């Protein structure tokens, strides 16, 4: 059959609308499944690292996202474009080269659009996609040409209805997609491993506990403490003191000219006439960052998201530090005195604020604090800090503070002597993000503030001891460990060391996954089918599969006939 113009093919399509619709459905579905399986193949073979596989799993739910998700839905556009190009197939070799070029371009445009949407524009990603797309276009174009020839033979020569003929490419595409997925599963599925690690000086871990905070591993999870807890409240801090009996006393000060540190806040002048009595509730809310400390009889951190824990040594003291996001920390009084002190860090995206206000609400009565802070000069840097105090009382509702350097507040909260074990007065800190830490003179005192409990995942550096299935791994101080989807337990052992151990489903050490299933596991899976890895290699190379394929493709394209389905 001679070459026919595209206009003539379009005219024929309009005369065979039903066949075109049937063909469009089955072809587009076939191309889509093949493209999705290609995405799966590229994802695991090209970039199987912590960056894109932190939560990956070869479970069914994870595999499904490569075929049925918003990201892969974009490839429907590519599938439609490739199908439209295939409609105009006439002579085999010309059609193949045209399809190859169009498929390569369409896939590259789609990938660039997705990379841009995911804000991951890097030249290495684009170049890698171009190479994979070329490989995919070569195979997909061959599939389309072979499918077209098969449909032409069945529909035009054997006169089998289009709806039955068009099912064959779809069934073939589904089988190919299943085979690719199965191979990826056998090669990249993970094997759960037993891990054990020590957290020592210099360690820094970010971790996620379990939903029940009482069962979670953590720092200051409902622990008695007689030393201050230092806090850097970075975002949206709210302090609430509650005394259900309403019998507490409170001395409240506006502090300026110094940081809120226990060593600086000494010999605070007290005017008993300005003390507040019968305090039931006290609240301070501030969006500005603030730094200070809270000292109570016990502390209970209630994280809602990932926490962080680091152990370090500064001068002659050890420090245990952590951070929380969107969380609460409760400091209980156990009917002893509570002290709360914070200095504001008036830093915004537009610079440093010199004028700002906040409210102190006591028993629903508002006291407005207006701050006017002079800028810090070069000469002031050499001056010794001196705290200045202004005690507030219920007689004045508004206070104007002209200060140097810093302003903040000091709360001295005095519960009644009547002991209420079930619900003693407490201070609750709510924050979107905060750091908290404690210092210790002796290392062994640190472990009193650690709660034994469960973890589900972690990211760690500075780990001194780490083993997988009993095998010790040699690590550098900067080596990074990532464990996800695990059943872990953290505790302080008899030797006064913090240990984390348990079962992990995903383990990375310095970007390298450590728990891929061994080749012996793949061997055992193949033995179920009465085969082995060597058998497969024999089939591939012993039968000369590659040579046979090349010979078939050569003979196929040599017979360059016109096989358009609508002519």
From Swiss-Prot:
Keyword terms, alphabetized: Cell membrane, Membrane, Transmembrane, Transmembrane helix
Cell membrane listed as a keyword: yes
Bilayer topology: Multi-pass membrane protein
Name of the protein this chain belongs to: Uncharacterized protein YfjW
Naturally occurring in which organism (per UniProt): Escherichia coli (strain K12)
Localization in the cell: Cell membrane
Transmembrane segments: 20-40, 69-89, 95-115, 126-146, 168-188, 528-548
GO CC annotation, single: plasma membrane
Domain of life: Bacteria
